[in-house]
């Protein structure tokens, strides 16, 4: 691998922005390393209340003590969080007493989001997804002879993810909060 790096910035509609930095050392003697960091954000997306942000990272360090053995340690992940515009009816539904049950597109418009609003002056989304499950591994490649090789991988992946909302069967949900 050759030594080198790059920096990139991308912007799009509805406030989408992404910046990426990457660098590779090339092989320096018996060692080599690569890194990539990425960040994106979009807080004014097409539908109100659907903003989010996330990162991506990749780190790899390689070691080649001789022509028969190669080792590589790698870590990568992509934490993210974003709000949702959960499905809504085309037409507003009302309760038997005439109060609005679920506002539809006829009230909110195409960019509307019945899961988003303001509470005490702060934006609040009832539906937010979050996720981060990094993966790390250690590879060992061994050339036994001209006709045989052995490749082993030890890896681990632990993380968390989920979402918020007032649907489901939990001990407590937003619909029960009064």
Please place each PLM-identified region on the residue numbering:
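Transmembrane beta-barrel wall of Gram-negative outer-membrane proteins
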Residues: 11-41, 46-85, 136-144
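Acidic/polar loop-and-plug regions of large Gram-negative outer-membrane beta-barrel proteins
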Residues: 68-141, 164-178
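Acidic, polar low-complexity intrinsically disordered regions
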Residues: 156-158
């Amino acid at each position: 691998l050759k030594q080198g790096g790059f920096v990139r910035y991308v912007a799009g509609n509805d406030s989408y922005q992404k910046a990426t930095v990457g660098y590779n050392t090339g092989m320096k003697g018996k060692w080599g390393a690569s890194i990539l960091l990425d960040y994106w954000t979009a807080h004014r997306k097409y539908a109100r209340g659907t903003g989010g942000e996330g990162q991506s990272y990749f780190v790899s360090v390689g070691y080649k003590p001789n022509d028969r053995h190669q080792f590589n340690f790698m870590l990568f992940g992509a934490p993210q969080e974003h709000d949702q515009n959960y499905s809504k009816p085309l037409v507003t539904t009302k309760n038997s007493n005439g109060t609005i049950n679920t506002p539809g597109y006829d009230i909110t418009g195409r960019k509307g989001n019945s899961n988003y609003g303001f509470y005490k002056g702060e934006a609040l989304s009832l539906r937010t997804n979050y996720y981060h499950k990094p993966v790390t591994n250690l590879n060992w490649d061994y050339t036994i002879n001209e006709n045989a090789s052995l490749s082993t991988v030890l890896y681990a992946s632990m993380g968390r993810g989920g979402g918020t909302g007032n649907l489901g069967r939990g001990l407590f949900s937003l619909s029960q909060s009064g």
